[in-house]
Amino acid sequence: MNRLSYLFLPLTAIGVSACSSNKAKEEVKRPNIIFMMTDDHTTQAMSCYGGRLLQTPNMDRIANEGIRMDNCYAVNALSGPSRACILTGKFSHINGFTDNASTFDGNQQTFPKLLQSAGYQTSIIGKWHLITEPQGFDYWCILTGQHEQGDYYNPDFNENGKQIVEQGYATDIITDKAIEYLEHRDKSKPFCMMYHQKAPHRNWMPAPRHLGMFNNTVFPEPATLFDTYEGRGSAAREQDMSIEHTLTNDWDLKLLTREEMLKDTTNRLYQVYKRMPADVQNKWDSVYAQRIAEYRSGKLEGKELISWKYQQYMRDYLATIVAVDENIGRLLSYLEKIGELDNTIIIYTSDQGFFLGEHGWFDKRLSLIHISEPTRQAEIS
């Protein structure tokens, strides 16, 4: 991978294809770009940021061989708007995509269009979540369904305007498609690929191979898990993202048996459960049976119940990230295999961060607001 000295110059000179020397003009091989984005991944769940919850060796590799940004903030704490800001370089009120009910105006300038006009092959594979079809890409294969959030199991895609269904787990499939695209690209041109995972977006559904992997793990609780918000403004008390009150028993905690889901097939959890193959459904039932039994034992209440909910949330959220890290490793290995790793700028980010129990919360949407201390006035004599 490109080290620090190579990370910025190619982006400022992207249209330059040759340089001069006293002896001859030699062609400069322009760098490839892979922009990796996950959904709702937070630094607390990345070991390269000192997170103690999960080891992420492949993300760590990107950080160790490049640079790690320690002071970056999302312009908008919602999925679609954050993506629109990244594409356009504009604030939400200027690019027009202010919330997830908006529709993206693809006619405006975006960085993939600029790269495409400079001779790059451009592609986006995975989550798009901007309603309109992508523009400025030679190839796209984007998740559809669940209001364009996409599904974890047997997901639907829009592939260059054609609707398809793929069998398997979304995080793996998106990587399969990314590698397949790289195999068949025009190798005479540099490429820019936006590699966008759905994971670990709510409701945190791990890959079949990772179901239950943390069932016997007890994760450390944040010091503010039982925060009462005393002395704080009304927003802290009135938020709707608390582990105690907002986590749902069905969608988030998955506290429904197969029989209960079949009694009400309109249930949101059943809509994703029914997409699983029979063997995955059986494993799911087995893994979550213990959780359901614990919850229904009648022994959990008060702070003990909050702690229990926190552990279930962490087990699903972190297990979902494991597949993300594994697949980053697959993609890095493929680039190494074809000899393109050292000529590829790799950027990893998330559309925004996420609370992992801090202040008893599990979601996002907290504005970065800093109020400076008023300047002290000089005494008037």
Residue map of PLM features:
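Hydrophobic alpha-helical segments, chiefly the membrane-spanning helices
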Residues: 380-381
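Formylglycine-dependent sulfatase
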Residues: 2-8, 12, 18-372, 376
